[in-house]
Design a protein with these regions (language model features):
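Catalytic His-Asp segment of secreted/periplasmic serine-dependent ester chemistry enzymes
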Residues: 165-244
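Glycine-rich anion/phosphate-binding loops
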Residues: 98-105, 133-142
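Serine-esterase "nucleophile elbow" of acetyl-processing enzymes
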Residues: 2-96, 101-116
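Structural recognition of the beta-strand scaffold that forms the well-ordered cores
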Residues: 49-54, 89-94, 119-125, 129, ...
Length: 244
């Protein structure tokens, strides 16, 4: 009788959320590589104490760097951005159509270099991974982003935002987002981050995002950003006091 030694278990594939990479999915309205270079330069030169790390929801709000010639499209509410960041040196590290792995690449290639060691870092990522990844893969990618931040900025205070609501034809999207937000809340508790869900103020009681707050059911309008800022500004002030 032939005895066959059992082999090692099959290697678990590394999820895409943990493989840093660049992207150019939004090339029609901005240049990803140029924005990255501008962001690195601003961080080096201004030594920010407030960083917003995210995708288009963050990118389209306001602040520097500014993408020319599409300033009007990509700066939906610079007034509320200024109110939310008042008294701090803020940089907008939001990049349209970024997935978690794209933000991870950016942070590993200079976007944190020069920031204050105790900077407040506001993180909102993952909605662009919903169609590509499992909830667990998204969570692990966001965890990796947060560890990248604390690995480079030892005293950073991380504000982890839950996913914003989105009007979707895909059944179960709202329930999935609610489940992911529970996971993010748990991650924040484990890692001593601050967790917040300002996106809740974007939706009606039935979970629908009205047109006056978002023309596409996800990205805030100026009125939507005003609501977000009203929730987020006091959380940022609370975070800034942690290291004083």
């Amino acid at each position: 009788e032939t005895f066959i030694m059992p082999g090692p278990p099959p290697a678990r594939a590394v999820p895409s959320t943990l493989i840093p990479c660049t992207q150019d999915r939004d090339f029609m309205i901005y240049d990803w590589a140029s924005r990255h270079e501008a962001a690195c330069r601003i961080v080096r030169e201004t030594h920010p104490d407030l960083l917003f790390i995210g995708d288009s929801i963050t990118h389209f709000w306001g602040g520097a760097p500014v993408d020319e010639p599409h300033r009007d499209i990509l700066q939906k509410s610079p007034e509320t951005w200024n109110l939310c960041t008042a008294g701090m040196r803020a940089v907008n590290l939001g990049f349209g159509y970024d997935r978690v792995e794209n933000a991870l690449w950016r942070l590993r290639h200079g976007e944190l270099d020069g920031a204050e060691d105790n900077a407040v870092c506001v993180v909102l990522l993952g909605t662009n991974n919903l169609a590509e990844n499992t909830d667990g893969e998204i969570l692990e990618g966001i965890r990796a982003v947060c560890r990248e931040i604390t690995g480079k900025l030892a005293k950073a205070v991380i504000i982890l935002q839950g996913f914003y609501p989105r009007n979707s034809a895909r059944e179960g999207t709202a329930e999935r987002i609610a489940g992911i937000n529970l996971l993010l809340n748990r991650l924040a508790a484990e890692e001593n981050f601050i967790y917040t869900e300002p996106g809740r103020v974007m939706a009606n009681s039935d979970g629908y995002v009205p047109e006056e707050l978002s023309s596409d059911g996800l990205h805030p309008s100026a009125a939507g950003y005003a609501r977000i800022a009203a929730v987020l500004a006091p959380v940022i002030r609370q975070a800034a006091e942690r290291e004083k």
